[in-house]
Amino acid sequence: MSNVTRQVTPPKARPKEVAKACVDAGFRAYRISTDSRGGSTVDRFENVNRVFELCKQVREGVGKDGAWCIDFHTELDMPDAIALANRIEPLRPYFVEDLIRSENPGVYRTLRHQVKVPIAVGEQFGPKWEWNELIENHLIDYARATIPNVGGITEFQKIAASCETHYVGLVPHFTGPISEAAMVHCCAAFSGPALMEMVMGGTRPWPYLNQSYDLRNGKLWPNDRPGLGVELDASKLQLIGDYKDHYELTPMIKRPDGSFTNW
């Protein structure tokens, strides 16, 4: 199963060098993001220009035959999302993800008529009913469904079947190595285009897995081990947070005038 690697550009590394390294390692595509979450105030106009320059470097890094994609992280307002998508179109992105906020999927009908880049969306979506309008009306090119969010393997397969009959590809959102193992099997049974998302190039060790999925030359392979093909060691699990009494708010991002904008 071909992979797209999701990786923030490391300090002191040039984006095109990181992109080239991922393609050289065998990954099908390299994904970047608008990545405005590092600060509390974001100037959207400056951010659009900065991201455009980043995209040019990444395209240079992957070469004319390599693939790259970008996640807008639902950060941009409609005019900026359209403007940036159209500016990067000549750079031939494999897809552009989450151009705008996901609460109103029908707005992708407007986007479909104003941008020509392949559109990916859906990591925040739940069961099949939330996908119906987008898939049946051909408003997206890739579904970013993920097993934990949609409600399990059966529901994921139903969404995949709908995608298959409407020529929509699958690029499941990474939600951890166990769900990733399940989605490898699901995507292996999918006849349309499919990519698996890997965090940090798939090189991160998972100490709580005695047996992990098989990653070779940038590709994920189903294996013949029982179940999902991974083995969890519960004794190595570690509690990372307790949210019974309080919870951490997502970052609050503001425009230069002090008004709140989407994270």
Task: Write out the residue ranges for each language-model feature.
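Short leucine-rich amphipathic alpha-helices used at interfaces
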Residues: G38, R204, N210, K254, ...
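Alpha-helical structural motif
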Residues: L54, S179, D233-K236
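Pocket-edge structural micro-motifs
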Residues: S2-V4, N217, D224, A234, ...
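Structural signal for hydrophobic packing residues in well-ordered secondary-structure cores
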Residues: R59-V62, R92, C187-S191, G241-K244
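Extended hydrophobic packing segments that form well-structured cores
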Residues: L228-W263
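Metal-dependent enolase-superfamily TIM-barrel catalytic cores that perform enediolate-based chemistry
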Residues: S2-R109
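Shared catalytic-loop signature of beta/alpha-barrel
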Residues: N86, R92-F95, E103-G227, E231
